[in-house]
Design a protein with these regions (language model features):
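Central regulatory/effector-binding core of bacterial HTH transcription factors
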Residues: 1-45, 112
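Short loop/turn segments at beta->alpha junctions
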Residues: 20, 74, 113-114, 132
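Hydrophobic residues within well-ordered alpha-helices
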Residues: 28-29, 78, 120-127, 162
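A ligand-binding cleft/hinge motif common to bilobed small-molecule-binding domains
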Residues: 40-46, 94, 116-146, 154
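Short secondary-structure boundary segments
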Residues: 40-41, 63, 133-135, 160, ...
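Flexible hinge/capping segments at coil-to-helix
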Residues: 46-83
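Secondary-structure junction motif
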Residues: 67-68, 82-103, 170-179, 188-194
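A late-sequence structural motif
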Residues: 148-189
Length: 194
């Protein structure tokens, strides 16, 4: 996505910040940044929300896990004590818990600070994890010993949106970004590995 963005918009001044959602919203409010790409649901009252993508979650396990042979898996089929989640405060964790309808997290014993750490733990046969659909292809190409299984719970499990201040004047810029992102995400989805 970034090479295409740079190619199509060579004069674009791009400042990429990876942060938790509430930090990004504060930066938008203060004018430190103009836009953010975020996963929803999240409380975005007081901001312009431009939704452009929906996706589901996939359960990631080693290929030798018998459950990975199925085309989909229900949340109740996954042992919480084997589930590797991201640390508290990460919206991906909140979205996964919500999609799986998990209220009591006391049995979840593995917490990783990043998704790449969670994947390394799965590769080491420590447990299993979930990833968003947009990450599946790249993940499986890099880790052929892993297998994705679609989470069979009502979806879509999350939405992706561009968030801006209410007084942001660049609606045409947002439309151009949405078109570019959607094109790239759609082309990525056509390349199925598993």
């Amino acid at each position: 996505l970034l090479p295409k963005l740079k190619l199509d918009y060579p004069n674009l001044n791009l400042n990429i910040i990876e942060a938790q959602t509430d930090v990004l919203l504060n930066k938008i409010s203060s004018g430190e940044i103009e836009l953010a790409i975020m996963a929803l649901p999240f409380n975005t009252n007081g901001f312009n929300v431009h939704k452009f993508w929906t996706e589901d979650f996939y359960w990631i396990s080693r290929k030798n896990d018998p459950r990975s042979k199925k085309p989909s898996i229900k949340a109740k089929e996954i042992d919480l004590d084997e589930l590797i989640m991201l640390e508290e405060g990460n919206c991906l964790k909140d979205h996964i818990l919500d999609a799986c309808k998990i209220k009591n997290t006391s049995k979840i014993t593995f917490n990783a600070s990043t998704l790449s750490t969670a994947i390394e733990l799965v590769k080491g046969d420590i447990g299993t994890t979930f990833v968003p659909e947009m990450a599946v292809n790249q993940l499986l190409v890099a880790n052929p010993e892993l297998k994705e299984t679609k989470l069979d719970e009502k979806g879509p499990h999350r939405e992706i949106a561009i968030i801006s201040r209410n007084n942001y004047a660049g609606d045409r810029d947002i439309k151009s970004l949405i078109d570019l992102f959607t094109e790239q995400l759609n082309s990525n989805q056509k390349i199925k590995v598993g």
